[in-house]
């Protein structure tokens, strides 16, 4: 995957100073030399972070799998064909093993198709076709879409805050509470399931005894679709570093409230069942 290169904290701060001084000649720069030195050395990651958000959150590559198995055979009386297929596309996000459930993006498809033709008599042919498919789409929880997450990744400066303060403390500020690390690891997940089932049966009777080539048929078709959305999203709290106390311990200000995980299971209105009978 081609990814753009973004400024590190040192170069971001240096160029920010240049732009500020151009607009405000005679003023003191926003970032002092001490700040620039700390960004460059990385000695104080809590007060002077340098986060490459793209590298920290996105994989350079991911796995896409597709498998197919087909079986066919038969005799003069019956013929059959069966196909099984499976597709799996893993997400591009990097997630920690903090949860018992998957918070990464994932897309899976299972499908099966079966065609059977049976000659009940020398003039009567019965054909049965079956098809089933299930799509499962997993996403990180919360209200932010994939597009919104990418926009956040591309807009966050490298020095805004660390990735986290340990896996249990998501970094952030009052103004910036949408930390991509928190979205991916502390927002729960949502899952969308779309199922399709199709079946058809056709009987064809030859009427050669009346006129050669004449036949009559009857068919029955069934189609059903089901949508199911499972929401297990939750809110998380962010921590803003405020320094060390008298005993040398790190102190933080917290923003937001951790919420209980949602537990909703909804079925879409797009359920469709169609029965179709034909004869001719």
What are these regions (language model features)?
Residues 1-196, 202-208:
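Membrane-proximal, glycine/serine-rich, low-complexity loop/turn segments characteristic
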Residues 87-109, 113, 139-141, 145, ...:
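Small-side-chain secondary-structure face that scaffolds active or pore-lining regions
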């Amino acid at each position: 995957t081609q990814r753009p290169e973004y400024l590190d904290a040192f170069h971001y701060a240096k160029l920010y100073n240049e732009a500020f001084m151009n607009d405000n000649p005679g003023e003191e720069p926003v970032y002092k030399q001490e700040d620039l030195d700390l960004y460059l050395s990385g000695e104080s990651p809590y007060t002077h972070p340098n986060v490459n958000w793209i590298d920290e959150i996105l994989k350079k590559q991911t796995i896409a799998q597709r498998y197919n198995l087909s079986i066919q055979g038969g005799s003069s009386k019956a013929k059959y064909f069966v196909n099984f297929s499976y597709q799996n596309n893993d997400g591009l996000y990097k997630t920690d093993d903090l949860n018992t459930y998957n918070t990464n993006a994932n897309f899976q498809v299972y499908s099966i198709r079966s065609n059977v033709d049976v000659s009940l008599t020398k003039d009567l042919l019965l054909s049965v076709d079956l098809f089933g498919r299930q799509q499962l789409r997993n996403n990180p929880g919360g209200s932010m879409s994939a597009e919104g997450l990418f926009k956040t990744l591309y807009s966050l400066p490298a020095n805004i805050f660390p990735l986290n303060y340990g896996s249990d403390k998501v970094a952030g500020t009052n103004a910036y509470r949408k930390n991509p690390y928190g979205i991916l690891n502390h927002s729960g997940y949502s899952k969308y399931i779309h199922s399709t089932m199709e079946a058809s049966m056709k009987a064809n009777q030859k009427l050669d005894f009346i006129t050669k080539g004449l036949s009559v048929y009857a068919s029955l078709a069934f189609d059903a679709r089901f949508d199911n959305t499972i929401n297990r999203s939750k809110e998380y709290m962010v921590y803003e570093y405020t320094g060390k106390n008298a005993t040398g311990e790190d102190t933080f200000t917290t923003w937001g409230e951790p919420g209980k995980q949602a537990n909703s299971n909804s079925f879409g209105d797009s359920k469709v069942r169609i029965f179709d009978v034909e004869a001719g």
